[in-house]
Amino acid sequence: MSSYSRITGTGSYLPPRRVTNDDLAKELATRGIETSDQWIVERTGIHARHFAAPEVTSSDLALEAARHALEAAGRKAEDIDLIIVATSTPDMVFPSSAAILQNKLGVAGCPAFDVQAVCSGFVYALTVADAMIRTGTARCALVVGAEVFSRILDFNDRTTCVLFGDGAGAVVLEASEEPGILASDLHADGKHVGILCVPGHVSGGNVLGTPLLHMDGQAVFKLAVRVLEDAARATLAKAGKTEADIDWLIPHQANIRIMEGTAKKLKLPREKLIVTVNEHGNTSAASIPLALDEAVRSGKVKKGETVMLEGVGGGFTWGAVLLNL
């Protein structure tokens, strides 16, 4: 039995429709909501995001990202013996988007389930897949983050609707004799539920509450920078590493100020920070694998380098994974 797991392929997918800040400002103006490219960029670092067509689901985006990851790993769908999808925007209440993705891949039999930790979801899912491989439950896992967050945005709230986008990212994680996933550190604190949530739910066929995203931006910012530093340091300690061992930091792509603040806390130069939030916006559980895939395919992040992944999201949830690519 192999003692470790390692990422052997990455993939991602963005819906074709790219929405710039100017595009969004024009759309919001028809609702009487004022914003601008300058206002958005200064506060978030976001210039554009992608929105899926109304008929496109999270599993549709996941399928494209999965195909790219499988190709990069030199694997076929039939080789996969575990599928985990991290999403907060599933196709249905049930079954899981992972089960739907499994069917779209044309395979059956292996375990398939969703993980819901919002923007920390991919870090959670990767940690679960690593544990299952280490215990021999799986040998070749497909781990996906996929979201259609545009469906749950309040376009009358300029402080939130400008932040998010749709997309998917995926990795193939395989059993390995050499260390890949070095350590992880996961946390949640339910007393912060109200600062980032979608408080509505369905009961008796009716929507109760508000089925749109609510966020206290200042509270999220203050908490995020602190807990991300703590998780990163805990993960390094578990792996017997220091900040100097990190070649690249790939945080959840939420807001450039949070990302730069975290890098500064870890004494990492800006050059070691992977940034895609400028073009993708916040894609929740998809943001980390999207950024990882873009960094790998551009040649920036290379095989053998040490990468810190960090996620923080509603719940409040947060965590980190340190890996050798």
Swiss-Prot record:
Where is it chiefly localized? cytoplasm
Q: Does the keyword Acyltransferase apply?
A: yes
Q: What is its EC number?
A: 2.3.1.180
| MF (Gene Ontology) | 3-oxoacyl-[acyl-carrier-protein] synthase activity; beta-ketoacyl-acyl-carrier-protein synthase III activity
GO cellular component terms, semicolon-separated: cytoplasm
Tell me the segments the record calls region ACP-binding: 253-257
A Pfam short name: ACP_syn_III_C
The listed locations are: Cytoplasm
Q: Which reaction does this chain catalyze?
A: malonyl-[ACP] + acetyl-CoA + H(+) = 3-oxobutanoyl-[ACP] + CO2 + CoA
Active site as annotated = C119, H252, N282
Pathway it belongs to? Lipid metabolism; fatty acid biosynthesis
Q: What class of enzyme is it?
A: transferase
Q: Which UniProt keywords apply?
A: Acyltransferase, Cytoplasm, Fatty acid biosynthesis, Fatty acid metabolism, Lipid biosynthesis, Lipid metabolism, Multifunctional enzyme, Transferase
* InterPro entries referenced in this protein's UniProt entry, alphabetically: ACP_syn_III_C, ACP_syn_III_N, FabH, Thiolase-like
BP terms from Gene Ontology: fatty acid biosynthetic process; secondary metabolite biosynthetic process
What PANTHER family does the annotation carry?
A: 3-OXOACYL-[ACYL-CARRIER-PROTEIN] SYNTHASE 3, BETA-KETOACYL-[ACYL-CARRIER-PROTEIN] SYNTHASE III
Summarize the protein's role.
Catalyzes the condensation reaction of fatty acid synthesis by the addition to an acyl acceptor of two carbons from malonyl-ACP. Catalyzes the first condensation reaction which initiates fatty acid synthesis and may therefore play a role in governing the total rate of fatty acid production. Possesses both acetoacetyl-ACP synthase and acetyl transacylase activities. Its substrate specificity determines the biosynthesis of branched-chain and/or straight-chain of fatty acids.
Concerning NCBIfam families, the annotation shows: fabH, PRK09352.1
Domain remarks in the Swiss-Prot or TrEMBL record: The last Arg residue of the ACP-binding site is essential for the weak association between ACP/AcpP and FabH.
Please describe the quaternary structure of this protein.
Answer: Homodimer.
Which family, according to the similarity comment?
Belongs to the thiolase-like superfamily. FabH family.
Any idea what this protein is called? Beta-ketoacyl-[acyl-carrier-protein] synthase III
**Which species is the source of this protein?**
Variovorax paradoxus (strain S110)
Lineage summary: Bacteria, Pseudomonadati, Pseudomonadota, Betaproteobacteria, Burkholderiales
Q: Which gene specifies this protein's sequence?
A: fabH
